[in-house]
Design a protein with these regions (language model features):
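Structured, active/binding-site neighborhoods that engage oxygen-rich ligands
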Residues: 1-122
């Protein structure tokens, strides 16, 4: 892995760990209830799914294998693969639905929900 990729992933993980406790909170609410304590080594689905993607690419000679990638994502959801505490958390509704579809045998190209409400973050 090149230094650029490694540095990018480390930056993502650090930013994710620092931002995760404040996720979904407004600046206004943080004025009255600031994040004062943070658990060490905790990151969200953003870092875990990035690590899954990199593991898949690395194991497949840096070629994208959608089935391998989805298997790793499903392993993350079901078993906490590449999570800090062995459990997936902070999963978005669209991501969860797509992975559940995959686990239930829906063809890969049909796993993602297809309506305008599923185009957001998560």
């Amino acid at each position: 892995m090149t230094d650029y990729i490694l540095n990018g992933v480390l930056g993502l993980a650090v930013g994710d760990a620092l931002g995760q406790p404040a996720q979904g909170k407004t600046r206004e609410s943080l004025k009255f209830s600031p994040v004062l304590e943070m658990r060490q080594g905790l990151w969200s689905d953003d870092t875990s799914l990035t690590l899954c993607t990199l593991a898949s690419l690395r194991e497949n000679d840096w070629r994208l294998d959608y089935h391998d990638l989805l298997r790793r994502f499903a392993k993350w959801l079901e078993y906490g693969y590449l999570t800090p505490e062995g459990v997936a958390f902070d999963i978005g509704a669209t991501t969860k639905q797509a992975l559940l579809n995959y686990l239930n045998g829906v063809p890969l190209e049909c796993c993602a929900p297809r309506n305008e409400w599923n185009c957001g973050n998560g």
